[in-house]
Amino acid sequence: AVAWVDKWPDWPSPALVLVGPPGCGKTHLGQVWQKRAGASVFEPGGAVIREPIETPVFVDSPNDPAHDEEIFHLYNSIAASGKHLLVATEVPPVRWNGRLPDLKSRLSAAPHISIEAPNETLIAAVMMKMFADQQIDVGAEVISYLVNRMERSFEAARLLVDRLNNASLATKRRITVPLAREVIQTPPEEDKEI
């Protein structure tokens, strides 16, 4: 997926579609591309689409069929202007049911890049980096404990690292397996009770 984003602006089509489960990094990758490309972010129901389109556009999670016509016109304007559209979605457009057929067919014809949920090794490495970025030393046994008990997504990793950091600061304890166990067993809304 990163290689395709790096190929911009030499995409073979006006659009590129990133497909993957929640928390797999689609939005993050789209935001990286947005900054690199100087792209706008599509806001459903936002400003009227002006032609010619002056910047590439990032559409994140186009899940509401009520915005299909707006996205369809955006796609056509992008294609006519020689710009690009990056779409991040959980379901490939070919499997969109009850959606605007013209939008579905155009996005189905665009190149699709699948991003899978991260595996244990990647989640462990990401969590180690997240802790290191906050200058927190956490042992491998803590990371192993967490990875085996958490949802496999970057967002879940970020939230868990934040919760552990907050619990560590609140209790003045190092982040260890016992503290990790307490945090995992405590619903997020009850974190202050740890």
Language-model-detected regions and their locations in the chain:
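Post-Walker A helix-loop "phosphate-sensing" segment adjacent to the P-loop in P-loop NTPases
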Residues: 34-45
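Conserved AAA+ ATPase "SRH/arginine-finger" region at the nucleotide-binding site
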Residues: 110-122
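Conserved nucleotide-sensing/catalytic segment adjacent to the nucleotide-binding pocket
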Residues: 50-89
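Walker A/P-loop nucleotide-binding motif
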Residues: 13-29
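Conserved C-terminal helix/linker of AAA+ ATPases
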Residues: 168-185
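C-terminal helical "lid" of AAA+/P-loop NTPase domains
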Residues: 144-148, 155-169
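Pre-Walker A (pre-P-loop) alpha-helix and adjacent loop at the N terminus of AAA/AAA+ ATPase modules
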Residues: 1-15
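Short regulatory helix/loop adjacent to the ATP-binding pocket of P-loop NTPases
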Residues: 93-108
